[in-house]
Amino acid sequence: MVGRRGQDRQIFLDGPYGMMTCVSNVPMNTSERSNGDPRGRPIGVFDSGVGGLTVLHELLVRLPREDFLYLGDTARFPYGERTPEELSRFSAEVTEELAGRGAKLLVVACNSATAAALPALRRRMMETTLGIDVLGVVRPEALRAVAATRSGRIGLLATPTTVASRAYEDAVGAIDPHVTLHAVPCPTLASIIQAGKQFDERAVQTVREVCAPLKRADVDTVILGCTHYPLIQPMLQRMLGPGVTLVSSGAALARQVEHALSTRDLQNPQSGEGEYRFLCTGDTEVFEQAGTRFLQMPLGPVERVELATVEVMA
């Protein structure tokens, strides 16, 4: 099913396992679900592909009464080597779609998009009459990593765009300026993981190569700076060693979302389990096949959407 294409809009930006109910791909009637109460509206979550489902999994476990609407921009996956300008525009288009479908809070479950566009997305959404908060994955991971390190040497595995943004350096430095971050760009790792094929020796060698600089730097904590990476956490742990703490964003971000809902009095008052639904911009069958592996829950039907074009202006 193809979602309705909205009118072109201008957006002004200036910077960088519990079970729930999975419903069909019939568009959620937000006013009917909430009866005018914003607490009954869904939480919007997005990623360039299915990696963000590792974050959604933690949200479903932590917040079982909430409704969720997940959008995977699979037609433009991967985001990891896109320019900051492209990521700002893509993120604006996705958040416009989710906000237009009634999201009460937005979660950027993509490290590259968080690094490039979170401040501007947050500012714009909070300045509109909607007052929608936008949360990302970088700061929760940075906080956990700084708390976990014993030596003050932290590693980062992330896409080239995320590494180049220095978003993690800034976040870690703001928390503890005495901590050193060793960042390693991984240009192909997310695509290898999303493809879902059996890891061959070449793929294993790719993982071994990105781990090598972190072993030489003698880090004791490693941030998994892409939401795809938790799926190969056992392999990463084996190659980095049992003494290295691996930090991913899902659980920490879920706690932050819970806090934001409580602070804004937006917790869903329903007594039963919430609903979760899925949208994607690419092939729905491919999304369903890969998504089940990432979410570790049934997906049900996926709705294909065509995003409205937006103009991102400084």
Set out the residue ranges of the language-model regions.
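Methionine residue identity
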Residues: 1, 19-20
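Short, low-complexity, intrinsically disordered N-terminal modules
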Residues: 2-5, 27
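Non-catalytic structural scaffold of enzyme domains
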Residues: 12, 22-314
